[in-house]
Amino acid sequence: MIRSFGTLRYSPALRAGVHTRRDGGTTRWWLIVDCDPELGRYLRHLYTIAKRRTRTLQAPLWGPHISVIRGEEPHDVRAWGEHDGAAIEFDYDPNARETDGYVWYPVECAAMLDLRERLGLAREPSPALHLTIGNARYTR
């Protein structure tokens, strides 16, 4: 596992102040961890090299990030926004995984799971915590 850090961000906007997605959904009840953009660039570069430069990745809309809460309305909304903007450490497995063109790395972080519990959500999210670095679905 490799240690890194990011910043907690509640209800992340898709564009300047916009929370509505193209499919009509919302990012209102989302909690992500913004990760270092350079980490994302580096990991996408390693992916491209591993694929012998035959595949590239498009960066995620939010940049490299960990989705801690994905649209689950918390049971205890009073705790929503707790520690917004705070730094948080996490460990990630350096072996990339790919699902439906999305490339990600498994993450371990007890503090993120503690936040889920404080909000009245199941400790373990589904899918499990992971660092998203890009997708190969829409690249040329």
Segments the model singles out, each with a brief description of its role:
Residues 1-140:
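Histidine-dependent nucleotide/RNA phosphoesterase domain, centered on the 2H-phosphoesterase fold
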